[in-house]
Amino acid sequence: MTTQFSVSGIELELFRYPSRQESNLQAWDAADEHLIKHLIDTEQTSISTAVVNDGFGALTAGLLSINPSWPLTLETDAKTSQLGTSQNLTRNQLSQESITWVNSRDELPQVIELVLMKLPKNLNYFSHQLNRLSHVLPAGTQVLIGAKAKSINKSLLETIEKNLGPASASLTWKKTRVITCIADGKARALPKATTWSVPEFKLQISNLSNVFAANKLDIGARIMLDNMPKGDYKSIVDLGCGNGILGLHAKQVFPEAYIHFIDDSEMAVASARENWALNKLDNPALVGEQATFGWDDCLTNMSEGFRPDLVLCNPPFHQGEAITDHIAWQMFLDAFRRLKNGGILHVVGNRHLAYHVKLQRIFKNCTTVASNGKFVILQAQKISKKAQEAEVEQAFDTETPHPQSALYGKPKA
């Protein structure tokens, strides 16, 4: 993995998050370089700037390298982006004092004079972000959007004009272009959440714009709903919860359980919270909060005493636009570490991802619960053995380059 970022005289060391990933993926792309180069070429001054969708801090670190006190507002929906940016700033000895951190639903500051933005994969979410900016940007404010050249077309420029102001694209550099949009000062209506029903499970679902499966039940979730685990579970985690549908149905099946919804996307966590309230799933026979909602990097920051007896998991295999299996690895390892002895990890995934190999390595057991032509449901049980637990704990050592390194031996040089 390349970690040395170099453009227009700026030199940085940047890592993806978590930094122990063992992959060929790097923490930035050429569009990040193009945006920084554009600012330097145009001699941009250090005015109040919003940085939107900065994957792991390349843009933020670049700006602070130009001026350590550049006033910045950082917007992201991904907790791993926030954590990765913070780590990279610390790694490069750049102060965070001039930064205001916001998620994609927080109120934006009224004084923004420039916007730097990376084009996200989800164009509905992109439109939502442009609509948000239209509420705070005065007419004439410049918005610079970095993207792969192949992603930029007439339709995209029309979308930008419709939601914020007229836009044009630069010449291509390293297969990327910078779109310059000039805000027209007209506030657009913010999009409403998409709502739909799952009548066979008597559930109503509401999705915000950056949540997977925006307006229908995805195939993986459906097979999972049809094949919930058997048992008597009291503490259940919906890990990578999305809109929360697995956890919602788990509460229907196990009404005595407390459900914990966790996702890297703040919009997903907010959608799960809304769906819990929408479906009125609290059991009057139980005391205390029956559902918790965490915007977090898997189970990283759960208290050490937290010991669920069931983890439901439909792992993503994308981080931004990158295809990677490290998220599944981290989910499985976190589940093993946190589950009580005898607890169950119940996983759905595409057959070609071969999750059974990973689960067998970590849990030393794996059972196929159900399958169809595309998906498979797997189940692994935590059977506590000191040597086995010690082996997995090594995978979380800060010196370990990748979550599965302790299971596979040393990474390749």
From Swiss-Prot:
EC annotation from Swiss-Prot or TrEMBL: 2.1.1.174
GO molecular function: 23S rRNA (guanine(1835)-N(2))-methyltransferase activity; nucleic acid binding
Region (Disordered): 389-413
Enzyme class: transferase
Subcellular location: Cytoplasm
SUPFAM superfamilies: S-adenosyl-L-methionine-dependent methyltransferases
Keywords annotated in UniProt: Cytoplasm, Methyltransferase, rRNA processing, S-adenosyl-L-methionine, Transferase
Domain of life: Bacteria
Keyword Methyltransferase: yes
Catalytic activity: guanosine(1835) in 23S rRNA + S-adenosyl-L-methionine = N(2)-methylguanosine(1835) in 23S rRNA + S-adenosyl-L-homocysteine + H(+)
Cellular component aspect of the GO annotation: cytoplasm
Alphabetized CDD domains for the sequence: AdoMet_MTases (cd02440)
Entry function: Specifically methylates the guanine in position 1835 (m2G1835) of 23S rRNA.
Family statement drawn from the similarity comment of this UniProt entry: Belongs to the methyltransferase superfamily. RlmG family.
Protein name: Ribosomal RNA large subunit methyltransferase G
Species this chain originates from: Shewanella pealeana (strain ATCC 700345 / ANG-SQ1)
Gene this chain is encoded by: rlmG
